[in-house]
Amino acid sequence: MGKRCILACMRMIQNIDYSEAKRIVDVVVEEAERLHKAAAIAVADAHGDLICFARMDGAPISSIRIAMNKAWTAARERKATKEIGEKVKHPEKGHDISYYGDPNYVGWGGGIPLWKNGEVIGAVAVSGLSSNEDISLAALGVELIAGS
């Protein structure tokens, strides 16, 4: 009986696969190059674990960890990191980022969850540029999968 309950309670989690993640990184890198910008790009699975990453020549060293943390946060919280950042700026809308109890959580714009068939399958994050540029490039990667 216990075995049946365990099996009945399990749920399959969809994840973005490597080929999709690589396509996202390639498209974002191509657009950043077209704009003469350099950034770090991270694509994570539904759990926030890294699948694909690129740091363009000239991107700040700090952008490496920040991009990975943005992807991790967006996937785990199923929200854009900018939205999380807005809540921590205004305690009446949410709470301090330290509430999460994990230094990986970030509230800077540029991390966006990837939704497919009503479920988060991963996240795309960009770091190293202005917040608006990070968001715009990450959104380009999300649109690549959402539009397919």
Placement of each model-derived feature along the sequence:
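Flexible, solvent-exposed loop/hinge segments and secondary-structure transition points
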Residues: 9-148
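Short, Lys/Arg-enriched N-terminal segments with co-localized hydrophobic residues
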Residues: 1-9
